Amino acid sequence: MGAIAAGIAMFGAALGAGIGNGLVISKMLEGMARQPELSGQLRTNMFIGVGLIESMPIISFVVALMVMNK
């Protein structure tokens, strides 16, 4: 039962991170197209946002391992 729960948790985290990354990057590209002079600042903010979004699957993976070993 723990393996099923871990798989569902990882699926949700990966799906959410993929959608979130796609939205962040698409909005960053829209902003760069509108204001090219802010591309450096937008890129920096995008990397911070993507890093925070990617922390969700990593934390979910750790929790899934804890659930499976319980």
Swiss-Prot record:
General function of this protein: F(1)F(0) ATP synthase produces ATP from ADP in the presence of a proton or sodium gradient. F-type ATPases consist of two structural domains, F(1) containing the extramembraneous catalytic core and F(0) containing the membrane proton channel, linked together by a central stalk and a peripheral stalk. During catalysis, ATP synthesis in the catalytic domain of F(1) is coupled via a rotary mechanism of the central stalk subunits to proton translocation. Key component of the F(0) channel; it plays a direct role in translocation across the membrane. A homomeric c-ring of between 10-14 subunits forms the central stalk rotor element with the F(1) delta and epsilon subunits.
Source organism per UniProt: Lactiplantibacillus plantarum (strain ATCC BAA-793 / NCIMB 8826 / WCFS1) (Lactobacillus plantarum)
Alphabetical keyword list: ATP synthesis, Cell membrane, CF(0), Hydrogen ion transport, Ion transport, Lipid-binding, Membrane, Transmembrane, Transmembrane helix, Transport
Keyword Ion transport appears in the UniProt entry: yes
HAMAP family, A to Z: ATP_synth_c_bact
Disulfide bonds: none
Name of the protein in question: ATP synthase subunit c
Gene Ontology MF term list: lipid binding; proton-transporting ATP synthase activity, rotational mechanism
Cited Pfam families: ATP-synt_C
Compartment(s): Cell membrane
